[in-house]
Amino acid sequence: MATINDNYLKLKAGYLFPEIGRRVSAFAEANPDAPIIKLGIGDVTEPLPEACRSAMVTAVEDMGNRDSFKGYGPEQGYGWLREKIAAHDFQARGCDVDAGEIFISDGSKCDCGNILDIFGDNNTIAVTDPVYPVYVDTNVMAGHTGPCNDQGEYEGLTYLPINAGNNFTAQIPSQKVDLIYLCFPNNPTGAVASKSHLQDWVNYAKSHGSIILFDAAYEAFITDPEIPHSIYEIEGARDCAIEFRSFSKNAGFTGTRCALTVVPKTLMAKAADESDVELWKLWNRRQSTKFNGVSYIVQRGAEAVYSEAGQAQTKALISFYLENAKIIREKLTAAGLQVFGGVNAPYVWVQTPNGISSWDFFDQLLHKTNVVGTPGSGFGAAGEGYFRISAFNSRANVEEAMRRITANL
């Protein structure tokens, strides 16, 4: 009989968001008339920018004409999109990133997991706690961890607690770790990192030969000019960091699927024989073998983000969600809850009232207010006693959800 990858059996009972979906579905089935408002999973609600829609319609027409039809595209992405990304998102901020170092993909979630294909099995790995579950679960699937303990922590991972006491920015570890996952603006806490904090991480990584896996999926929500948008704004980062970005939240591409990963050509890691190997070459080989590229139509839509109209429309989208976050922050703070995040990020991180557990607060809100959020404990042991509320919804739903919650605390 064929055998399985036993590492999957080490995963906790259910990925966080499917478990939320299961509980919400059970509640909805028992209460079919309940007006449920979902502020849990970070999915957008507003339509794609008109500039993107128009570009995609034109691209569809291209596919209907023999002269402009496109078949397989470059696995790395079309040059016209990569050039615009390099110029606007990186070079305009003083980052030394070339278009040839950018790989277009169908999601940063995929890339965060797939990047492990080019790293060895013996690397030590550090994640913050709480943390986006994908970083942990993909390492479990790849066999990089031992079993899970009662607190949900996996043997073999180095957990770096982030909490109100350290302003939700992890302390540099005293021991050497090889791969370091950082996410700023942070999911789930909404925290941001100063330039000096990121410089400390880069200095650590360079001194230990470590690689930083930097998730910048929410960088477009940064409004503070002192906060870096990219790890490559930090001196030395090209020698120790890979960056992931996405069009999902800034341009509403959660259902359209387009993202990017930057792998500098100067970035090296060790082979078993102690020789230095360019990670760019490995990632390029991996993508060329396992990925056929993002749809031409979708890439044209992403390119339109960088047009004058696209920039104005995406800015309006971001401002809309940030205003939602402001409403959530202000209403819950006024109701007496301790609230974090939601300023340079679309997530608000709330301390649960009266010391109740994260899942108990989830059930309380669902049953009393018909509002869905995300239990902090689902992001790690240090998330217990916290709750994430997403700003991704309509203004009317956000205002109604806050009315219900504040009336039932």
UniProtKB/Swiss-Prot annotation:
Residues annotated as binding substrate: Y15, G42, K109, Y132, N187, N292, R388
Source species, domain of life: Bacteria
InterPro entries linked: Aminotransferase_I/II_large, DapL/ALD1, PyrdxlP-dep_Trfase, PyrdxlP-dep_Trfase_major, PyrdxlP-dep_Trfase_small
Gene Ontology terms: biological process: lysine biosynthetic process via diaminopimelate, diaminopimelate-aminotransferase pathway
Protein keywords: Aminotransferase, Pyridoxal phosphate, Transferase
Family from the record: Belongs to the class-I pyridoxal-phosphate-dependent aminotransferase family. LL-diaminopimelate aminotransferase subfamily.
Protein name: LL-diaminopimelate aminotransferase
